[in-house]
Amino acid sequence: MQVHVGRIGKPHGIRGEVTVEVLTDTPQERFSAGAVFSTEPTSAGPLTVETARWNKDILLLGFEEVNDRNRAETLRGTRLIFETDSVASDESESDSWYEHELIGLEARVGDQTVGKVSALNPMPAQDLLVITTAAGEEVLVPFVAEIVPEVDIAAGFIRLVPPGGLFDINRKDAE
């Protein structure tokens, strides 16, 4: 199973280090020296972590395959994918899900389907679900129990209790 754990940002320095947007709860485990990542696009990898360090709140990685800033620049935007056989929802954590489990679920308000989950954006305060409506509009929904009280992976839906105006805030015809 493949799990998206990070996205490469801009180069840092001249020796090929890059900044990484961390998309995992366990960066110390995932980004340790020797870890091997598949990449998207596949032409960028695989990449093997040589060094991992934090500069303030930013993760800096050095890869064995990257030894200068020019090569590091070509990796900007590359997704880092961790391959594992042991990724499954932990039964003891009934309120934890992986992004791949949520994408494609119907988003319902009451019994009405208002869209589908198209992405999960990890943020410092709380994660945001990206709901794509039938009209193709994207709505960002805070992934908190008060707004998303029910997630039923087996049945293929999430239930929303959105605050007033959440689905209208970005509509072009709402003015």
UniProtKB/Swiss-Prot annotation:
Gene Ontology MF terms: ribosome binding
GO BP annotations, alphabetical order: ribosomal small subunit biogenesis; rRNA processing
Keywords tagged on the record: Chaperone, Cytoplasm, Ribosome biogenesis, rRNA processing
Membrane listed as a keyword: no
Recorded GO CC terms: cytoplasm; ribosome
Subunit structure comment from the entry: Binds ribosomal protein uS19.
NCBIfam families: 16S_RimM
Protein family: Belongs to the RimM family.
Record note on domains: The PRC barrel domain binds ribosomal protein uS19.
Function of the molecule: An accessory protein needed during the final step in the assembly of 30S ribosomal subunit, possibly for assembly of the head region. Essential for efficient processing of 16S rRNA. May be needed both before and after RbfA during the maturation of 16S rRNA. It has affinity for free ribosomal 30S subunits but not for 70S ribosomes.
Protein name: Ribosome maturation factor RimM
